[in-house]
């Protein structure tokens, strides 16, 4: 089965945190409203966004779930390689040679617009 090391999980958490302001912008929500969606306090969202606290894996999966439920943020996390094939294989408990069983529908024209440097 595909595994993610603690270091890989932490890298994903840090990467997602760096994109949270843009994700909130795409959802058109404040830190408070976003916190209510993902089950975190406004101060916790703030320190995660400012890099003063590394989100937990449970917080990562909660935020990723909200992103996956919204077309714009789903495209955004896909375009910025936060939602990857390996992550999906891990979450679905797949072997390395078995692709994830997810149909990720995206608007291809929008992917370049969402990609960050």
Region roles according to the model:
Residues 1-26:
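A short, Lys/Arg-rich alpha-helix, primarily the initiator
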Residues 28-47:
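Short alpha-helical DNA-recognition segment
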Residues 2-10, 31, 62, 75:
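Recognition helices and adjacent regulatory flanks at domain boundaries
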Residues 20, 31, 42, 57-60:
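Helix-turn-helix DNA-binding elements, focusing on the entry/boundary residues of the two helices
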């Amino acid at each position: 089965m595909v595994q993610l090391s603690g270091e890989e999980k932490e890298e994903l958490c840090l990467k997602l945190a760096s994109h949270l302001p843009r994700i909130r912008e795409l959802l058109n929500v404040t830190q408070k409203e976003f916190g209510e969606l993902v089950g975190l306090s406004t101060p916790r969202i703030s320190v995660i966004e400012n890099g003063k606290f590394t989100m937990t894996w449970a917080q990562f999966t909660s935020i990723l779930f909200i992103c996956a439920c919204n077309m714009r943020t789903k495209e955004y996390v896909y375009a910025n390689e936060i939602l990857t094939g390996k992550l999906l294989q891990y979450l679905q408990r797949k072997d390395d040679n078995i692709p994830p069983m997810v149909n990720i529908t995206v608007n291809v024209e929008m992917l370049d617009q969402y990609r960050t440097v």
